[in-house]
C-alpha cells in the first residue's frame, strides 16, 4: 500500500464551530520522488523506492551518490520503500504529492519514538513502587523477584526488567485527517504521533477502518 514520507512539525490545536478544541499534529509532506522501481523478476517483489527533501552532494556517500545519479533524481534526505501491486504504473523520477490523501479520512502514521535511555521497571513497565516505610529502607523502586527456585532455575525470556526505553519503530493507527493544506503541503491529523519534532514519518491510508 503506497503512502508518503513526511516530517513532524509539532503539535497544535484547532477549534470547531461549536468551540471544542481538537489536538492536532502538523505533518509536512513535500513531494516524494521515485528513485527505483522493484519488480518480481529482479527483486522477488513489487515496490517503489522514494526520497524526499534535499541533501547536499558533499554529504552523500559514494553508493548513495551513484544511486541517485543512476536514477537521475535530486538527492533527498533518505530512502523509503512502499509495496505496490504489479498493475500499478509508476515511473522513475515521478513525483507523488499530498493530494493522494484527498479522499482518505483515516491514516496510519509510523515513526521512531523518543529515546528515553536506560530506564527502571517503574518507568518502563509501570511497576508499582514498594512501601516507603514499614521497615523498607532500600527497596522502594526495585522490581522484586525475577524467578522461582531450582526449578526452572532460570529467568524466563521476555521477563519485564530494566533496560533501554524508547527509540523503537511505532505505528499509531486510525488517526483522523482534520485538514489538508495543499498550498503549504501540510497534513493535520487528530492526536499525537511517534517521535520528536523534525523526525521523519511514514503516512499511509488506514488498514483497519
From Swiss-Prot:
PROSITE patterns on file: RIBOSOMAL_L3
Q: Which GO terms describe its cellular component?
A: cytosolic large ribosomal subunit
GO MF annotation: an example: rRNA binding
Pfam families from the xrefs? Ribosomal_L3
Q: Which Gene3D superfamilies match?
A: 3.30.160.810, Translation factors
Q: How is it modified after translation?
A: Methylated by PrmB.
Is RNA-binding given among the entry's keywords? yes
Recorded family membership: Belongs to the universal ribosomal protein uL3 family.
User: What functional role does this protein have?
Assistant: One of the primary rRNA binding proteins, it binds directly near the 3'-end of the 23S rRNA, where it nucleates assembly of the 50S subunit.
Protein name per its UniProtKB record: Large ribosomal subunit protein uL3
Protein source organism: Buchnera aphidicola subsp. Schizaphis graminum (strain Sg)
